Amino acid sequence: MTIQQPITAPVPQETAPAEAPAKLTPMMEQYLDIKAAHPGLMLFYRMGDFYELFFEDAEVASKALGIVLTKRGKHQGQDIPMCGVPVERSEDYLHRLIAQGIRVAVCEQMEDPAAARARGNKSVVKRGVVRVVTPGTLTEDNLLDARANNYLLAIARSRGSSGGDRLGLAWIDISTSDFIVTECAFAELTATLARINPNEVIISDALYSDEVFEPVLRELAAVTPLTRDVFDGATAERRLCDYFAVATMDGLAVLSRLETTAAAACVTYVERTQVGQRPPLAPPAREATGSTMAIDPATRANLELTRTLAGERRGSLLDAIDCTVTSAGSRLLAQRLAAPLTEPAQIGRRLDAVNVFVADSAAREDIRAILRGAPDMTRAMARLSVGRGGPRDLAALRDGILAADQALGRLSALDQPPQEIAAAMAALARPARALAEELSRALDEQLPLIKRDGGFVRSGYDSTLDETRNLRDASRLVVASMQARYADQTGVKALKIRHNNVLGYFVEVTAQHGDKLMSAPLNATFIHRQTLAGQVRFTTSELGEIEAKIANAGERALNLELEIFDRLCGQALAIGDDLRAAAHGFAMLDVATALAKLAVDDNYIRPEVDGSLGFAIEGGRHPVVEQALKREGQPFIANSCDLSPTPGHKSGQLWLLTGPNMAGKSTFLRQNALIALLAQIGSFVPATRARIGIVDRLFSRVGAADDLARGRSTFMVEMVETAAILNQAGERALVILDEIGRGTATFDGLSIAWAAIEHLHESNRCRTLFATHYHELTALAAKLPRLFNATVRVKEWHGDVVFLHEVLPGSADRSYGIQVAKLAGLPPAVISRAKSVLAKLEAADRGQNARALVDDLPLFAVPSRAAPEPAMSKEAEELIAAVKALHPDEMTPREAMDALYALKAKLPKG
């Protein structure tokens, strides 16, 4: 967790120092005033082409960015630390600071330095903070992950009468205008936050100081405590109404008091960080409780839904299924994966859309080709709405509207499109085509990234602009002809007319010709301005007049372009809701066609999803592992699983899975959880048939990891996660558990696993997959009617184990741990000793005195040299000799079969 700590500038002390300190410059006084008005923020203070940082800000930035720390002047007798970053590269530095949880106030020059000089020598350029950059309020492309939402989330609390807190949550993405609210109990908060995955969380300072919330806050990326007035429920509705410019919220959304408070906190924080600007947001959409599958953070991490355990996207489930071709589509797919649906009808509508594009490959590929040309309109709109957009953002809107026309034309050929596709088509039809036509006429072919320097309006669009540009360009041609005339007049062929920001236009000659221009009669025309080491510079009254004309024409042309930009921007923002709807339509089509491509390429089938407690998967495969094996040219062994209620029982089954390590137990557990999850996001699934009754909660206890920061051992983490499952899982949950109890003594672990199985069977009564190495547990099938024993098939060959990865009814009689250890490369001496110990343990009576067993098998009886090979029997020697005498390459199939039977006959009987 990153907590926003205040970054402060020193305050002048009232007591005078021993020696008079250097007086602060007017500029530094201005800096300290602005800094004091923005506590807790790093201040980027604009000075010309740089953002300067001073005092503690400079020290923090120097370390965070790896830039040189220097000094500028003194304060209270001490050097003032200083560093700076160039304005043109500032967004790169902002990205690095934001990634470290540092919030930044950007302070710009609000006037031209010439205006300050005109007021007097001691006047300072007017400056002001124009925005506050925080992790949850970003809009720039290079500060955002194009494939992920960037959520700001607010939490409001209400004390329950029975002691149970209720929480209101509101989360927004100002880069896409998304705005969602919900309520939850404190016990549900961790799972809800894991699903939303906010980039920044704002809470009241009272909530921040509450010890009960400390474990929750620790798991969050960035937490910003705010004063209580931001979470004032009495003013919340008024603040929301002000933001949306309505008299009442009733026409936009019906929210609870807690939801209203959290939503108001969000918009208040946005207004503060955007310095009074109000990015357009969708009306708050209320998320119904229980409408999505609940998945706790541990399960999300263990199943590697969006990130692997190493924190990488590559190798996750999202990476495996993401075939989208647009950023908006990728974001929507990630949203769906984070929140699988629990309503069969909604799931069915999504599956219908995917099915259309599975069946019609031509339509699928045509739509995907169109989508590749559809830009990210929502984020372009967000930048334009807060004054950070450029000409390319306007072009994105133009191209998006044109792509919408293309998509509609192709989709119109579909016969009775399903509801999801029909909704996307309706959204694509909303934006007025007149805007695209206007933008096409106005924008040039080659567009600059920013509007500041102009050059983006097409010639012929505005006659006044064309005339002004002609005047500007003609004046520059006059300068070129003037240079030729001055060269003839002076006889100095090397004479040049140049320009810089200090002198403006000037005549430049080499030093050897300088005296000539400063002597009569040329000195009447050429006025000396500057002498350098090798050049002398002059001006003329004629050149001054031309410069004024060029400057005026250039400035006027730029102002005209900026006026045109603002007008076009206003036209776009006026239909912002329609443009955002079209962008969402693109995203819906992208997800549907992407999942269809995945289904066709990887042979997925449409699942049957209903309200039963069924769970029958035939030929199921792990979507991520299968792709990894495919890249290596290896097949994936499919397996079936049926946790559906058996005849005479209402609740689902509990499968007890035994088998050796590396046989595929964990893969089998995970693949069934992932298939259920894919089905409920509306995707086809990797199986030959799948019937899944809605899963309302998904739990997993797989893998092993400690939590040293919270003082938890690996076993403690395992027990905490198991406790959550046993306390929370209901009949409609799906639970996967892998080797419960392995982190402690054998009999302790066996006892815990035994009791957990009984509790899951009798109390939770949920559909469960339970993998274990405790073979004694398989005996529970005799007394627990819904427990089914399954095992992963293996085969031994000459002392080695061959993993067949097939799940079959039955139970394993051994774990093959020593064979797996041998495969891992343990020294032969250790393997030999392990076999010897295992033989004695298996022969020993488990009830015998422990001391006697330890005496028989001392823990540290490690041989000082390699263990001797066991003596070989005469029969074994004869078998080896017979095998060595065979030459398979020279034998016919019949001869090989006869030889095999002959060898078998030599084996000892019994």
Curated annotation (Swiss-Prot):
GO terms for cellular component: cytosol. GO terms for biological process: mismatch repair. SUPFAM superfamilies: DNA repair protein MutS, domain I (SSF55271), DNA repair protein MutS, domain II (SSF53150), DNA repair protein MutS, domain III (SSF48334), P-loop containing nucleoside triphosphate hydrolases (SSF52540). ATP binds at residues 659-666. GO terms for molecular function: ATP binding; ATP-dependent DNA damage sensor activity; damaged DNA binding; mismatched DNA binding. Keywords: ATP-binding, DNA damage, DNA repair, DNA-binding, Nucleotide-binding. InterPro entries: DNA_mismatch_repair_MutS, DNA_mismatch_repair_MutS-lik_N, DNA_mismatch_repair_MutS/MSH, DNA_mismatch_repair_MutS_C, DNA_mismatch_repair_MutS_clamp, DNA_mismatch_repair_MutS_core, DNA_mismatch_repair_MutS_N, DNA_mismatch_repair_MutS_sf. CDD domains: ABC_MutS1 (cd03284). It comes from the Bacteria. The keyword DNA repair applies. Gene3D superfamilies: 1.10.1420.10, 6.10.140.430, DNA repair protein MutS, domain I, MutS, connector domain, P-loop containing nucleotide triphosphate hydrolases. This protein is involved in the repair of mismatches in DNA. It is possible that it carries out the mismatch recognition step. This protein has a weak ATPase activity. HAMAP family: MutS (MF_00096). Belongs to the DNA mismatch repair MutS family. NCBIfam families: mutS1, PRK05399.1. This is DNA mismatch repair protein MutS. It comes from Bradyrhizobium sp. (strain BTAi1 / ATCC BAA-1182).
